[in-house]
Amino acid sequence: MVSSSATAPRSGFYYFSQGWKLVTQPGIRRFVILPLLVNILLMGGAFWWLFTQLDVWIPSLMSHVPDWLQWLSYLLWPIAVISVLLVFGYFFSTIANWIAAPFNGLLAEQLEARLTGATPPDTGVLGIMKDVPRIMKREWQKFIWYLPRAIVLLILYFIPGVGQTVAPVLWFLFSAWMLAIQYCDYPFDNHKVPFKEMRTALRTQKVANMQFGALTSLFTMIPVLNLVIMPVAVCGATAMWVDCYRSKHALWK
């Protein structure tokens, strides 16, 4: 059981592992079904298509490697594959999160209530429908914050040498932070915490959030496991919210 008051900081690895445990809790599983279905349908189809295209995309990406780096091609090839998986995985997980955002918010709310014993607002299906415009506005805020930064990093991929060495590392770090924002935002948004204030709060536990986001990013690239990662990450992020942020930011007790 996660405490409802602020506790000593734990690692992002801990909260990620908690997500796997919490997602199977009795009473929670029914709120997991819809996010899970969205993720299975979208990510399953997307990665099936991706693996049919890799033999075209990877040689194209490797063609940008300058002659003086050709001797490292045996190392750059797996980096190129990982780069494609990172970019592709993050792109489609973002789409899946847009579609499932109302259900992810409900999952975070119900899990928080069970972890803390607090009484959440009376939502239900009607409440979710009323909240959809606000939730979509929040997703749009995240997208606007993310897009210009992602474009800059994607441009780096087309710079010979940099695109095959530095860019993948920067993209991984960026996607780790962005996935931490994506999943931690659900419990924050349930309490109407502004997007900017939420980002400021996450920076107080930046290492833990980077660890959490990095693991989420890695599992997003792994076939089969990436089909269930969405509800797992929501549960893990909600546990982190309860331990680290709820005492200061909670709207309902």
Curated annotation (Swiss-Prot):
Can you say what this protein is called?
A: Sulfate transporter CysZ
Question: Has the keyword Transport been applied to this entry?
Answer: yes
Q: Which residues form a coiled coil?
A: none
Q: Which GO terms describe its cellular component?
A: plasma membrane
What sections of the protein cross the membrane?
A: 31-51, 75-95, 151-171, 222-242
Main location (coarse class): membrane
Name the species this protein comes from.
Citrobacter koseri (strain ATCC BAA-895 / CDC 4225-83 / SGSC4696)
Q: Which PANTHER family match?
A: SULFATE TRANSPORTER CYSZ
Q: Which GO terms describe its biological process?
A: cysteine biosynthetic process; sulfate assimilation
Keyword annotations for this protein?
Answer: Amino-acid biosynthesis, Cell inner membrane, Cell membrane, Cysteine biosynthesis, Membrane, Sulfate transport, Transmembrane, Transmembrane helix, Transport
Q: Which gene encodes it?
A: cysZ
Its job:
High affinity, high specificity proton-dependent sulfate transporter, which mediates sulfate uptake. Provides the sulfur source for the cysteine synthesis pathway.
Q: Any idea where this protein resides?
A: Cell inner membrane
- According to its record, how does it sit in the membrane? Multi-pass membrane protein
Q: What family is this?
A: Belongs to the CysZ family.
In its UniProt record, a GO molecular function of this protein is: high-affinity sulfate:proton symporter activity
**What NCBIfam families does UniProt report for this protein, alphabetically?**
PRK04949.1 (NF003433)
